[in-house]
Amino acid sequence: MAADLPEATVQNILDQESLKWVFVGGKGGVGKTTCSSILAICLASVRSSVLIISTDPAHNLSDAFQQRFTKSPTLVQGFSNLFAMEVDPTVETDDMAGTDGMDGLFSDLANAIPGIDEAMSFAEMLKLVQTMDYATIVFDTAPTGHTLRLLQFPATLEKGLSKLMSLKSRFGGLMTQMSRMFGMEDEFGEDALLGRLEGLKDVIEQVNRQFKDPDMTTFVCVCIPEFLSLYETERLVQELAKFEIDTHNIIINQVLYDDEDVESKLLRARMRMQQKYLDQFYMLYDDFNITKLPLLPEEVTGVEALKAFSHKFLTPYHPTTSRSNVEELERKVHTLRLQLKTAEEELERVKSG
């Protein structure tokens, strides 16, 4: 079934010039970082500037490009308009807390609201990014569960803001009095955390609007043709719909293509299994752009390897057709050699006459 359907590419993403935010996510171990890196490379060929951000604590982006990245945008070697950065999705509590006896109180307040630390960290990062002039920003996200929490950050921060407003109205100047007791009035007051959240409010509202705008934001799901990955992809697509975040591209990675030369029973069995799930992907997501990528015998690391693999994102991969073309050319060469040999023998007979 899947083999009969036309192959899609990620060209539609490159053609959508209004896109500002591109998220790449999926189950762990499916090749998200490789796909997000190559997608950023493809976008850099048609955009004035591209920034790729890793929000995965594992930070595989440096490994993919074989270049050290930090929490500040760094120019990727070999490019003039592609930048990369790796950020910690959890807030640095040392930056948030006071000193001496107050840091425990501050931490308790921050931790009292589930997810507030990650949400504030992500909002601060977006606030920084928005001050920079990048045409498109690609997110290499953590596995599905972390990604969904990340996408909830606007609601989490709004909830945190309302809770702290409620605390302020109920307890008045209690926190200010406590800060005076510790001699920290200048460093910590009742409005410290509240002020920080309010400072992010405009960013939250603006980004939330942009994330829900299909002209500005899209989510690319990366998966492999196996049951658990199919399940995670469906869960992700359903959750994205709840968040009103556009998604219309799926990349199916590590596909084994049918090859007449394959004799291994194990590979044949894996091909049959993959084909079953490929059919299900095409049935479930018949209105999506589905890009299939082959399983390679080696890892794709380093700029040159990423660039070499990038053409498979824009041109459907057809190994059978390629093999047939090569075999046809080889047959033609063999025939011409035979004809040349026959002609040379005929020429020798004529000469010896």
From Swiss-Prot:
Deletion consequences: Strong reduction of root hair length.
UniProt-listed GO biological process terms: protein insertion into ER membrane; root hair elongation
Residues annotated for ATP binding in this entry: 27-34, 226, 253
Family annotation (Pfam families): ArsA_ATPase
EC number(s) recorded for this UniProt protein: 3.6.-.-
GO CC aspect terms: cytosol; extracellular region; GET complex
Catalyzed reaction equations: ATP + H2O = ADP + phosphate + H(+)
Main location: cytoplasm
Coiled coil: 320-353
Uppermost EC category: hydrolase
Keywords: ATP-binding, Coiled coil, Cytoplasm, Endoplasmic reticulum, Hydrolase, Nucleotide-binding, Transport
GO molecular function, one term: ATP binding
Residues annotated as catalytic: 56
Subunit structure: Homodimer. Interacts with GET1 and GET4.
Function: ATPase required for the post-translational delivery of tail-anchored (TA) proteins to the endoplasmic reticulum. Recognizes and selectively binds the transmembrane domain of TA proteins in the cytosol. This complex then targets to the endoplasmic reticulum by membrane-bound receptors, where the tail-anchored protein is released for insertion. This process is regulated by ATP binding and hydrolysis. ATP binding drives the homodimer towards the closed dimer state, facilitating recognition of newly synthesized TA membrane proteins. ATP hydrolysis is required for insertion.
Identification of the protein by name: ATPase GET3A
Taxonomic placement: Eukaryota, Viridiplantae, Streptophyta, Embryophyta, Tracheophyta
Gene: GET3A
